[in-house]
Amino acid sequence: MKIIKYVLSLAILNLIALILVTLGLPDIVPLHINIFGAIDSFGSKWFIPIIGMIPVLIAVIYIIYTYYLQSDLNKEIENKIIPTIAIIFIPFTWILVIFSLKFSDTVNSLHPSTNFASINIIVFVLVILALLFIFISFYLENLKQNWYIGIRTPWTLKNELVWKKTHKLGKYTFRIGGILLLIHAIAVFLTFNFFYAIIGLIMVIIIIAGIPILYSYKEYKKIKK
């Protein structure tokens, strides 16, 4: 509980910093990067502090949850995973700021420097996600059946044995997926290919989430026969 309060304080300070930085940005800033690493969408600079609200909201909602809804079932694991997710969102909130400081709304989105910045940011995102997946993998198998956190499919929620088997498998898919994503991040950095960075990320997500979902369905049908 103390950790999430520290995270909330950090998230609020981060939001204040984002607001102060936003005041000095152009009124129109880059908001979206396509699969080729080019900026293809612009909008109001005040979208940046809105993104900065995400870690604040995660922390606030979790604090409310701990007071009124949290049980002892997965308390220890939840108190590690949720604050970590909130902390990880904080550096993500600065991605648009980085682009805004480098480019204005008149920048040609195909300029080489734009693609270079895009690659650096996607590599950063891949590494953070990889570490998050690996971190979560150490706790998945010990998660008890619940409606809030874990691999929640219709079949894991209906059957406790399916829940246990799916999360045991998920421990390995998350860990393997995280390691593959780290390797992929290095490859993206070396090859300078934004398109394949996105394709690789999608493939890893299929490994991490798709396999356990299909497995839970298969196991549930097997038990019901």
Regions found by a protein language model. Give the residues of each.
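N-terminal membrane topogenic signal
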Residues: 1-11, 46
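Select subsegments of transmembrane alpha-helices in polytopic membrane proteins
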Residues: 6-8, 50-52, 61-63, 81-89, ...
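Active-site and channel-lining beta-strand-loop segments
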Residues: 19-50, 149-158
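Membrane-water interface of transmembrane alpha-helices
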Residues: 21-25, 57-68, 135-151, 215-222
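Alpha-helical transmembrane segments
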Residues: 41-55, 118-136, 203-204
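Ordered, amphipathic secondary-structure segments that act as subunit-interaction surfaces
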Residues: 64-117
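Small-residue-rich transmembrane alpha-helices that serve as helix-helix interface/gating elements
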Residues: 128, 196-212
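Short membrane-interface loop/juxtamembrane segments of multi-pass integral membrane proteins
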Residues: 153-169
